[in-house]
Swiss-Prot record:
This is Casein kinase I homolog 2. The lineage of its organism: Eukaryota, Fungi, Dikarya, Ascomycota, Saccharomycotina. It comes from Saccharomyces cerevisiae (strain ATCC 204508 / S288c). It is found in: Cell membrane. A lipid is attached at C545, C546 (S-palmitoyl cysteine). Residues 1-33, 44-55, 497-530 have a biased composition (Polar residues).
Amino acid sequence: MSQVQSPLTATNSGLAVNNNTMNSQMPNRSNVRLVNGTLPPSLHVSSNLNHNTGNSSASYSGSQSRDDSTIVGLHYKIGKKIGEGSFGVLFEGTNMINGLPVAIKFEPRKTEAPQLKDEYRTYKILAGTPGIPQEYYFGQEGLHNILVIDLLGPSLEDLFDWCGRRFSVKTVVQVAVQMITLIEDLHAHDLIYRDIKPDNFLIGRPGQPDANKVHLIDFGMAKQYRDPKTKQHIPYREKKSLSGTARYMSINTHLGREQSRRDDMEAMGHVFFYFLRGQLPWQGLKAPNNKQKYEKIGEKKRLTNVYDLAQGLPIQFGRYLEIVRNLSFEETPDYEGYRMLLLSVLDDLGETADGQYDWMKLNGGRGWDLSINKKPNLHGYGHPNPPNEKSKRHRSKNHQYSSPDHHHHYNQQQQQQQAQAQAQAQAQAKVQQQQLQQAQAQQQANRYQLQPDDSHYDEEREASKLDPTSYEAYQQQTQQKYAQQQQKQMQQKSKQFANTGANGQTNKYPYNAQPTANDEQNAKNAAQDRNSNKSSKGFFSKLGCC
């Protein structure tokens, strides 16, 4: 699921922010600049829609039997698939009681790192917080965990793409102010986010009061940084594994240090510069593997001066990043000071935070439109392909040749190269066609081997005609994957059984090729057996049976 927010700016005075004056309570926001005596509509967070379900608590019990398999949680009807990611699959849905749209997240129950249950708990903690979607249901349906929450609009990343991968300073300032407020509210609930990125900030749905309000979603990485009752901060640690998105994560996170509130604030600073510049200096770095790539990104961040990053931009953005990078591990960020610092940018430009954003100017002033900006992504609302960088490159240097001889020679070379490339392509296509035909023949043979009844083949052929965005198609894919996993496990078990000797021990090697243990190995094995016997006797003696 995906989303959006509004930015803020600051003055060239390099406004100093005293981080020591902040306490752990929410700061007073009365100093935020007002338009005509009121906060701009875009800076208000509207309350979540009431779905009138009677009880919004999630159900942990298994699904009840129903005639309609497209209904989950008793009254949420599954619509089309609108997104897919590492967590699972996202569907559009409808609350059948009141007809309001919802988002339904599916996560395989046997996934290695399940997140939906933790995410549901976080939504419960944040219930009623402005800019946080309301949760309606959590439970198990078949092979999946399911979470039902508010359906929102596109993400800031989507809008960034639609706007040509560059936001105006005014838009960035207004978005930044909203982002800071959202993270402040999260921190006030004793949580840190740990995965700040544009994809996780969404705007509302069109036609709603919060259509341009920024929301925060996807709390799978969120973590408590202090005890909710005692307010005792977690201890500082090092050698921690990386959590978050490398492009935006803080320098301390790259260094393996425990994350706290300061890391969320620094990651937001990187997002602000991403919106202003179009890309960050540490994007596109190459490395043999991810570990080395993350190290190179972290090193580039350390070596890049914040004011070099802000060159040609309002200096307040560089000042913000400098301040938050100097926060101590347990220090409370000065959220209000940061908002005022960034809003001062608008004062310098003679602008106001009036709730006007770049994406509102799209399509002749009609704003973003899914019928035009249409390419499904993780959040369901898509963005067009990024600008083609190759198209911006200059033409080949061969155009500098002006004489006919040069042109003729160049054209001959080009024709020869094209002919060679065409011949190679035809040869490759022929090989691929042969391989495809062989694979299809083998698949057909396997199908009739496993399912000699023609009716099964007809059902499979009919099922393949399903709409790929439908829930039925997703169910079919899930069942096929599950069947393949089961078949794989059975094959592994059969192989293991075939290699098992009479004493039940697995013969890892062919009988004639069994390795012989030397004296040192025999002594080591004997010692292990003695220790095992001692431990087992000790266990049973506690039960009084030995």
